């Protein structure tokens, strides 16, 4: 059992035979010649709603316009990544990845596009909702399923 922050280091040093990494760590391991990306957990598992935003009902009721604007901003970002090149996207996101060079960012963005990681909209599909509940249930983290229509 290795702390998540140390998984790539453990793999590169030979303490682990495999690792599951987020980007940019996965691509950096490849660039160091220390390993290869052989599969995408996301692609192999199906679309899992990995990132979600939630607020209390009281906040929703008092900040409806703000939350609608936030949702439009997310959709605008989705539209951007679906209509621009990896080079253009890498240029925009580069300030968020100060320790990662532009070519590496381009490679990561391209990999995500090839894996169909970028959604076209913010709709939380029933199939994905069921899949995340299956995963949580199998892990023993879900006491009771929630109806999609709720």
Feature-to-residue mapping (PLM):
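Pocket-lining segment of extracytoplasmic ligand-binding domains
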Residues: 5-97
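Residue-level signal for threonine
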Residues: 56, 125, 150
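Hinge/cleft segment of the Venus flytrap/periplasmic-binding protein
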Residues: 144-150
């Amino acid at each position: 059992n290795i702390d998540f922050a140390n998984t790539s280091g453990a793999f590169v040093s030979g303490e682990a035979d495999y690792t599951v990494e987020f980007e940019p760590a996965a691509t950096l391991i490849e660039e160091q010649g220390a390993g290869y990306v052989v599969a995408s957990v996301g692609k192999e598992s199906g679309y899992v709603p990995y990132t979600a935003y939630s607020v209390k009902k009281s906040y929703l009721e008092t900040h409806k316009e703000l939350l609608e604007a936030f949702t439009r901003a997310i959709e605008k970002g989705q539209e951007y990544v679906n209509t621009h090149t990896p080079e253009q996207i890498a240029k925009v996101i580069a300030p968020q990845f100060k320790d990662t060079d532009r070519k590496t960012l381009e490679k990561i963005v391209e990999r995500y596009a090839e894996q169909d990681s970028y959604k076209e909209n913010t709709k939380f599909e029933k199939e994905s909702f069921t899949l995340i509940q299956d995963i949580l249930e199998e892990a023993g983290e879900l006491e009771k399923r929630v109806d999609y229509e709720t």
